[in-house]
């Protein structure tokens, strides 16, 4: 699949065979994606590949279930590869809160700014920062409720949603950009290789950061509302847009956005997962879709590898 095209993911297993057969998917990406499929014998038979010869090369997207006892030692070793914890930094005279995960190796490493959903910086997003750190990225999740006391100051998610609605979008975008600058200032981050990803509300924020912050090197908005189309001409960031096939509200804005991106010759790729709904990546929510989440995670890692890790 070339950049500046959009695709619908067809049942995932069938799509993998089609993509590798037509040269749209590298063998490395094919093997990594095949490793997450359960019951993928049809793919193995079609490609003449032995399933036992395939080992997952990337972190699984699902952490909803506890690890089996047999993997406890491996999990401990994996966690020893990263350091994680809360951070604070200044922006416009205010203290912003966040959670940062990074590889223990000295680096410098590429960085990723993560923007949470519209319910605050909940544990799921802390986990995503750790997953990315295990892949080699210094990852900062900014608490976009910092100006209201922080996520931990709210008793329930309804109050978090209400508080976020009370913060101007431009302010939230600027707080995201402040997080990018904080990452760039860290000695273990390569300031020239910083990207952003976000989910739901955070996906929309990442789109707005992408059209306004030329220092970003890659962006991955998950089911985020489209930016103002007039701003698309300002985009200097390669964007991977992840969408859910059953997400009618967000998908209504995709055709116009896609047309604007193509007209401006921008680097982008859109992937949609039929049968998945808005927020399908969140493994703590009722709409979690394990297969779509796993595939979207590998798409994300491939995008960041191409535009952050290998650049």
Show where each model-derived region lies.
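N-terminal secretory signal peptides
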Residues: 1-29, 38-41
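N-terminal cap/lid segment of alpha/beta-hydrolase-fold proteins
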Residues: 66-104
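Short amphipathic alpha-helix adjacent to the substrate-entry channel of hydrolases
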Residues: 123-147
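Gly/Ser-rich "nucleophile elbow"/oxyanion-hole loop immediately N-terminal to the catalytic nucleophile
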Residues: 155-197, 307-310
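Primarily recognizes the serine-hydrolase "nucleophile elbow" in alpha/beta-hydrolase
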Residues: 178-236
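Short beta-strand/loop motif that positions the catalytic acidic residue
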Residues: 241-243
């Amino acid at each position: 699949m070339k950049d500046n095209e959009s695709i619908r993911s067809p049942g995932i297993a069938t799509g993998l065979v089609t993509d590798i057969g037509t040269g749209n998917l590298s063998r490395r990406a094919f093997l990594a994606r095949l490793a997450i499929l359960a019951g993928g014998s049809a793919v193995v038979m079609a490609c003449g590949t032995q399933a036992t010869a395939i080992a997952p090369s990337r972190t699984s997207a699902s952490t909803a279930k506890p690890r089996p006892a047999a993997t406890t030692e491996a999990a401990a070793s994996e966690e020893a590869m990263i350091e994680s914890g809360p951070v604070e930094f200044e922006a416009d005279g205010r203290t912003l809160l966040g959670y940062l995960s990074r590889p223990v190796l000295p680096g410098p490493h590429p960085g990723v700014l993560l923007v949470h959903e519209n319910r605050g910086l909940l544990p799921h997003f802390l986990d995503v920062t750790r997953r990315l750190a295990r892949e080699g990225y210094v990852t900062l999740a900014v608490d976009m409720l910092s100006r209201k006391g922080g996520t931990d100051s709210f008793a329930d998610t309804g109050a978090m949603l209400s508080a976020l609605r009370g913060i101007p979008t431009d302010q939230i975008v600027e707080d995201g950009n402040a997080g990018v600058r904080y990452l760039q200032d860290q000695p273990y981050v390569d300031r020239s290789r910083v990207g952003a990803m976000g989910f739901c509300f955070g996906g929309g924020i990442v789109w707005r950061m992408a059209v306004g912050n030329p220092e970003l090197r890659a962006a991955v908005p998950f089911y985020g509302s489209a930016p103002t189309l007039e701003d698309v001409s300002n985009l200097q960031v390669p964007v991977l847009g992840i969408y859910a096939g059953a997400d009618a509200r967000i998908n209504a804005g995709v055709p116009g956005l896609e047309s604007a991106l193509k007209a401006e010759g921008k680097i982008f790729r859109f992937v949609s997962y039929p049968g998945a709904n808005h927020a399908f990546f969140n493994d703590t929510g009722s709409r979690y879709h394990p297969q779509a989440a796993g595939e979207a995670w590998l798409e994300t890692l491939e995008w960041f590898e191409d535009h952050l890790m290998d650049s």
